[in-house]
Amino acid sequence: MLTITPTITPIPAYTDNYIWLIRQHDQAVCIDPGEAAPVLDYLHAHGLTLAQIWITHAHGDHTAGIAELKQHFSGCPVYGAADIPQATHIVREGDSIAWQNHRAAVWHTAGHTAHHRCYLLNQQHLFTGDTLFSAGCGRVFPNSRPQWL
């Protein structure tokens, strides 16, 4: 059986964030669109349609671009935890998300936030949001609970 590997592209956002795009053929999945403009620029430059949005947690630097993206791609589903108002599909530990011939396992990884999610694509690529930072662990806040970690 032929396995097609998607292209994964980081898009810098703000001063220290990344928005992730997973693309295959003429479609893309966007993870944590904190800003819409760089995502729209990339999609238009590459002739892509936005098929899905996956959100790791409810902080604005990961969600602020959702509304504008939905204006351009109105039928695009948004996957995330129940505390994300824009989520059209609530995902929990053990769920999976299907897209084209790919599957992402959903992990509940509380710590940075109580309802944080990570997505493991095809058992190979882990999208952690703020559970992990580049060259280090993610940040927790004073109101974080030890049982989250």
What are these model-derived regions, one by one?
Residues P6, T15-N17, R92, A114-H116:
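Short beta-strand-initiation
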Residues T5-P10, R103-A105:
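Short, hydrophobic/aromatic-rich segments at coil-to-beta transitions
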Residues Y14-T15, A28, P33-W107:
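Active-site HxH/HxHxD metal-binding segment of metal-dependent hydrolases
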Residues T15-N17, H25, A135-G136:
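Active-site-proximal loop/helix segment associated with metal-binding centers of metalloenzymes
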Residues W20-R23, S96-N122, L126-F127:
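Core dinuclear metal-dependent hydrolase active-site scaffold
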Residues M1-T3, R23, Q27-P33, H46, T113-L149, ...:
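Metallo-beta-lactamase
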Residues M1-P6, V78:
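Short Pro/Gly-enriched beta-strand edge/turn motifs at strand-loop
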